[in-house]
From Swiss-Prot:
In the soluble state, catalyzes glutaredoxin-like thiol disulfide exchange reactions with reduced glutathione as electron donor. Reduces selenite and dehydroascorbate and may act as an antioxidant during oxidative stress response. Can insert into membranes and form voltage-dependent multi-ion conductive channels. Membrane insertion seems to be redox-regulated and may occur only under oxidizing conditions. Involved in regulation of the cell cycle. This is Chloride intracellular channel protein 1. Signal peptide: none annotated. CDD domains: GST_C_CLIC1 (cd10300), GST_N_CLIC (cd03061). Monomer. Homodimer (in vitro). Interacts with TRAPPC2. Dimerization requires a conformation change that leads to the exposure of a large hydrophobic surface. In vivo, this may lead to membrane insertion. Interacts with AKAP9. It comes from Mus musculus (Mouse). Pfam families: CLIC-like_N (PF22441), GST_C_2 (PF13410). Residues 93-233 form the GST C-terminal domain. The modification Phosphotyrosine is found at Y233. The gene is Clic1. One of its GO terms (cellular component) is nuclear membrane.
């Protein structure tokens, strides 16, 4: 007889109305992990301005997101992800870890470059900061268009050409995608709204990657509304003057 699954509840940051999902890439990351695991779970949005007594008791520190697994409370996004990967494992649940270590680090500096770009108010620095963001996106594009070791046929003398895989580590979403995609989505929304910047069409690997991701419910349905992201960055994004 199959072991009964413990109750799983993810507590995430609420949006501006105190109810819908707010802007938080860490919350979305864990939301995606649970969805991909195929486990039954609940998501509770927490209004950071009006925390309920239940939330205060469960997590006095108030750090979001946090996970209730049975009666255990888990905090820290990285540790929660490790815990879920260890507890919700094969044969009942899929393994989500990437096979290639490079998949876990590719594109991770994009968010830092984006933050520097969007927080800058000095027009004289704008071009260089934009170039820094473009360079980071180019590194990701190179990784996405380069064949993974398992895509290379060592017996063939022909050049393998451009990878056509859907995601960072292959044709299935992994933990690496759960980490990167929520941040890439924020970059797209915020840069377009506050800088009129869009990811260049020349970065075909990145565009293919995002297109494949938005076609997956686990990503598209866990994204906060664009308005929530724009609102979160309203005070962060500095006007050039």
């Amino acid at each position: 007889m199959a072991e009964e699954q413990p109750q799983v509840e993810l507590f995430v940051k609420a949006g501006s109305d105190g109810a819908k999902i707010g802007n938080c890439p860490f919350s979305q990351r864990l939301f995606m992990v649970l969805w991909l695991k195929g486990v039954t779970f609940n998501v509770t949005t927490v209004d950071t301005k009006r925390r309920t007594e239940t939330v205060q008791k469960l997590c006095p520190g108030g750090q979001l997101p946090f996970l209730l697994y049975g009666t255990e409370v888990h905090t820290d996004t990285n540790k929660i992800e490790e815990f879920l990967e260890a507890m919700l494992c094969p044969p009942r649940y899929p393994k989500l870890a990437a096979l290639n270590p490079e998949s876990n680090t590719s594109g991770l500096d994009i968010f830092a470059k984006f933050s520097a770009y969007i927080k800058n108010s000095n027009p004289a620095l704008n071009d260089n900061l934009e170039k820094g963001l473009l360079k980071a996106l180019k590194v990701l594009d190179n990784y996405l268009t380069s064949p993974l070791p398992e895509e290379v046929d060592e017996t063939s003398a022909e050049d393998e050409g451009i990878s056509q895989r859907k995601f960072l580590d292959g044709n299935e979403l992994t933990l690496a995608d759960c980490n990167l995609l929520p941040k890439l989505h924020i970059v797209q929304v915020v840069c377009k709204k506050y800088r009129g910047f869009t990811i260049p069409e020349a970065f075909r690997g990145v565009h293919r990657y995002l297109s494949n991701a938005y076609a997956r419910e686990e990503f598209a349905s866990t994204c906060p509304d664009d308005e929530e992201i724009e609102l979160a960055y309203e005070q962060v994004a500095r006007a050039l003057k």
